[in-house]
Amino acid sequence: MFKLWCCPPYTFDVEKDYWNKYRKIQIMGRKLYLPKELTSQSYVEDEQWKVTEEFLRPYKEELEEDILKLEQKYSGSISLSSGACLHCKKAECTRVSGEPCRFQDKMRYSIESLGGNVGKTVTKYLNQELQWVEEGKLPEYFMLIYGLLIL
């Protein structure tokens, strides 16, 4: 059973309906350093993901608002989110019950979920390196990467 509408598999053709439909993509990234008190601790898995979610959520909400405003500026554009949808928790997403998304006007797919290589993109175009969560340990920083597909 698939958990979130923003995650594959999709009922549309990713190449045709996303990548090939638009003439360019604008990539935006934000580097977020974690406080030392978070990076110096060890975590069990559930705690680690909870701390990560609590740290990232306000930044993701702010950046999502900004990129949705950019969609308004560029007619026919569509934004790509940084990671999973913020509007439902996994247990609440209507995909589990086979019903349509309740937030179709807000839900956006991520670059990764559409097959984009975010790591290579960040290195090549933003001259940065991604850091990843390791077992029991948080990275020094996270990078939130958004995209705007423009007709």
Annotated model-derived regions:
Residues M1-L151:
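Catalytic cores of enzyme domains
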